[in-house]
Swiss-Prot record:
ATP binds at residues 8-15. Keywords: ATP-binding, Kinase, Nucleotide biosynthesis, Nucleotide-binding, Transferase. Its EC number is 2.7.4.9. Coiled coil: none annotated. PROSITE patterns: THYMIDYLATE_KINASE (PS01331). Belongs to the thymidylate kinase family. This is Probable thymidylate kinase. The lineage of its organism: Archaea, Thermoproteota, Thermoprotei, Sulfolobales, Sulfolobaceae. The keyword Nucleotide-binding applies. InterPro entries: P-loop_NTPase, Thymidylate_kin-like_dom, Thymidylate_kin_CS, Thymidylate_kinase. GO terms for cellular component: cytoplasm.
Length: 194
């Protein structure tokens, strides 16, 4: 089983790009492999709690995201997938909650029983661009997005990428077609090596 996660600050295009890559994988690989596209947070009950808490309690948020992940992965693994495409995963919890002052090692310990992604696509863009995109979205929940918050989260993501060679950075300031082309090249190359 391979896990490919899509990460980045809110507004970076994770949902759009992960869906397009999933569809390209279905066409390229065909139905002979079980490929699942999913996103976090998953449970509607936990999403409601997360929206209620907002940024006020980062410890509770980290615990809720981790509980959601445990529940979510349990359901996914029962389906015996060969490839899982994740719109957010462990690095999101690390980037967001550690930017709020929670110790990264504590977050990692909470998540140590979950499989690490085999490949992570980090869609990177400036917080100002992200804010402009978020303002145009009406279908996703988000907290009170601020440039200062997104800047801290972006810095944490870039720090994680420097420490982990499984994370590939894609410039999300480009057009969707360019982002898809670069991302597809990375994913396709990765899967061809296994």
């Amino acid at each position: 089983m391979f896990i490919i996660s899509f990460e980045g600050i809110d507004g970076s295009g994770k949902t759009t790009i992960s869906k397009i890559i999933y569809e390209k994988l279905l066409i390229e690989i065909g139905s002979n492999k079980k490929i699942i596209l999913t996103s976090e947070p998953f449970s509607q009950e936990i999403i409601k709690l997360i929206e209620e808490i907002g940024w006020k309690d980062p410890i509770s948020l980290a615990l809720l995201f981790t509980a959601d992940r445990a529940y979510h992965l349990n359901l996914l693994f029962k389906q015996n997938p060969e490839i899982i495409i994740m719109d957010r995963y462990i690095d999101s919890t690390i980037a967001y909650q550690s930017s709020l002052g929670i110790d990264e090692n504590w977050i990692r310990n909470l998540n140590k029983y979950f499989p690490e992604p085999d490949l992570t696509i980090l869609l990177d863009l400036k917080p100002e661009t992200a804010i402009a995109r978020i303002k145009n979205k009406v279908d996703k929940f988000n907290f009170d997005e601020k440039i200062s918050t997104l800047s801290k989260v972006r810095e944490k993501y870039l720090e994680l990428a420097k420490r982990n060679n499984k994370i590939r950075i894609v410039n999300a300031e480009k057009s969707i077609d360019e982002i898809v082309e670069e991302t597809w090249s990375i994913v396709y190359s990765f899967l061809n090596h296994f």
